């Protein structure tokens, strides 16, 4: 059963200021909690239904566990439907950026759903790190974690000033624009940085100054634009096939 203090903490961690204050974040739903545990991430506490505990006993064994009924879990979860498990995980120190291979950098991508999907896409294509500009969405937002479908546990997120990073980088910097060289005709290097811009404004002018390989996804129909997560997947697919 959830105590009042536990309920209060779970609700508080839906907000960025309390995640930062406590150094904790929420992982919700059976799939995401399983991925969290499989990755060996630091966990403070797990709240779970009897069915989830029975199905994941070995994974849960080392952790502090609170048995809850499904109604309790649904009541405190930020998800529309979650009656299996919620974990309180500990925020880890930011990883060191590795620029020896392909790096994906997001310039002010502010929509949590898009960011979560991009993390999932990056995981699909084998990227172990993503760089976020300082004004991109919080990658520990519950909506982001949920949208990753477990990929948050395998992809490190590094938040930094993109202009500073790009100004000292000595490899190709690809940027997605409405105009540029077609991704189908670009010979991608195995080492490089791909910059994707925000949903509403694209790549900022300050960041664009550091891009030396502007690229575009050619359109064959009448749609005005592509969702940034969809566009990221298309470009990464071309980079992996031609790089």
Residue ranges and their predicted role:
Residues 38, 96-179:
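RNA substrate-binding interface of SAM-dependent RNA methyltransferases
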